[in-house]
Amino acid sequence: MIALIQRVTRASVTVEDEVTGEIGPGLLVLLGVEKDDDEQKANRLCERVLGYRIFSDADGKMNLNVQQAGGSVLVVSQFTLAADTDRGMRPGFSKGAAPDRAEALYDYFVERCRQQEMNTQTGRFAADMQVSLVNDGPVTFWLQV
């Protein structure tokens, strides 16, 4: 399971001219689900995403996680993160989970975030989405479990 996380001052996702999720300061989480992923990996990745200390403390040091910084989380499914880009000029998607399994694990990940009392907004699974963000820093990390 893969999370591309970006520290943002604001982010939103729109589907068919409807805003489905919007946050102020916090994390935009682009989530990719691979074939061998399961609930255990989703739990671990959620723990890492919410615990990752990439927000500045009073001394300007990256020492706070999103909850400590008072931020929110916007989770957007992105199957292209599971692409095989090792060769050729076209990505392959054989590493990605089947859509029904990927959606179940995406929903599970979102619910785990909410269970941590995290303000968690979402996109719409498998939809054509427009994602807007202001990357703060820029600060972007690839987390994989």
Swiss-Prot record:
Keyword hit for Repeat: no
Keyword entries, A-Z: Cytoplasm, Hydrolase, RNA-binding, tRNA-binding
Keyword Metal-binding: no
EC numbers: 3.1.1.96
Reaction catalysed by this enzyme: glycyl-tRNA(Ala) + H2O = tRNA(Ala) + glycine + H(+); a D-aminoacyl-tRNA + H2O = a tRNA + a D-alpha-amino acid + H(+)
Class of enzymatic activity (EC top level): hydrolase
GO terms for cellular component: cytoplasm
GO molecular function term, any single one: tRNA binding
Short motif (Gly-cisPro motif, important for rejection of L-amino acids): ranges: 137-138
GO biological process, one term: D-amino acid catabolic process
Subcellular location: Cytoplasm
Subunit text: Homodimer.
UniProt remark on domains: A Gly-cisPro motif from one monomer fits into the active site of the other monomer to allow specific chiral rejection of L-amino acids.
NCBIfam families associated with the record: D-aminoacyl-tRNA deacylase (TIGR00256)
UniProt similarity note: Belongs to the DTD family.
Functional summary from the UniProt entry: An aminoacyl-tRNA editing enzyme that deacylates mischarged D-aminoacyl-tRNAs. Also deacylates mischarged glycyl-tRNA(Ala), protecting cells against glycine mischarging by AlaRS. Acts via tRNA-based rather than protein-based catalysis; rejects L-amino acids rather than detecting D-amino acids in the active site. By recycling D-aminoacyl-tRNA to D-amino acids and free tRNA molecules, this enzyme counteracts the toxicity associated with the formation of D-aminoacyl-tRNA entities in vivo and helps enforce protein L-homochirality.
Protein's recorded name: D-aminoacyl-tRNA deacylase
Species name: Enterobacter sp. (strain 638)
The gene coding this protein: dtd
